[in-house]
Amino acid sequence: MLGGTASLGGDRVTEYRTPAPAPAPGRVAPARGLVALATAMVVLGGALVAALYVLFVRTATGQRFDQAALLRIDTNPERTRDIVGVLSDLTIGVILAVLAVCMVVSLLRGRLAYAIAAAVLVAGANVTTQLLKHGLLTRPDHGYSYSTNNSLPSGHTTVAVSLALALLLVAPRFSRGLLVLVGSVAATVVGVGVVVTGWHRPSDVLASVGVCLAWAGLVSLWLLLRGSETPTSRREPGGHPGLALVGAVMAVALAFGYGVRPDGTWRDLVVHGCTVAAIGLGTALCLALTSRVVPHDV
């Protein structure tokens, strides 16, 4: 900031600058790269939702491919019933229980801001999903599905991903890698599960990941700008992308081993594999980026 000028001998003018205000005691200024990364997460998440909606909902070609992927990932009725039973347990009670854990962990560690961020992330992502699905977005009838009700984004996937991210926000640094791994497995299993049951198309699942990514970036940006960094804050380089990817691969292998695979042609198998891989990579990226951008004390 330009503070003023000083004259020397009537000829020379020297500019002086007012120093930037120091961070609050016990805090450090956020790195610009992390602020940029959090901002990019918000933009990327929003852009992903918009692109999926325009390409796979608004266009006839997109609807055809999306519906074909849905049909090729279907499995036998017995497996579907089992998956429905598991997904039905993702109720409001589960959300409240996980949020309660987040609150307790944050308060015990003296990090009220992180408890607030976790609650805002879960509430914001799930409310946004419901508003988009039932209020703001419509699905034109191009003749490729039996229902014209919009199903993008997936509510169940939003619940799973947002809860995994909330736990990642409040957990101590030593447990972050394990949470990235477990969260990637759980979120991918739920994402694949809602497609297998026929509740959602693949684009719905990926859109819910985009919603969660945007909200994770938003609350991370708030934590960074408010000065939640401390001198002991540390990050593992890259945010454990390897563990996130391993978790997604484990989830896909678990689904295949359980019988969630097509019984048709090689073409069906390729489409099936690409679909579950896209879901797994999307959830892994979301968790890895959030782990990278959020400060964690030992």
Regions found by a protein language model. Give the residues of each.
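N-terminal transmembrane-helix/juxtamembrane module of multi-pass inner/ER membrane proteins
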Residues: 2-93, 133-144, 274-278, 282-298
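Interfacial segments of alpha-helical transmembrane regions
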Residues: 36-40, 104-124
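C-terminal TM-helix exit segments that contain a strictly Trp-centered aromatic cap at the helix terminus
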Residues: 47-58, 128-137, 193-197, 249-260
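Alpha-helical transmembrane segments of multipass membrane proteins
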Residues: 48, 125, 129, 190, ...
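Hydrophobic alpha-helical transmembrane segments
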Residues: 87-110
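Membrane-water interface at transmembrane helix exits
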Residues: 105, 129, 133, 137, ...
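Hydrophobic alpha-helical transmembrane segments of integral membrane proteins
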Residues: 116-145
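Membrane-embedded catalytic cores of phosphoryl/pyrophosphoryl-handling enzymes
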Residues: 144-279
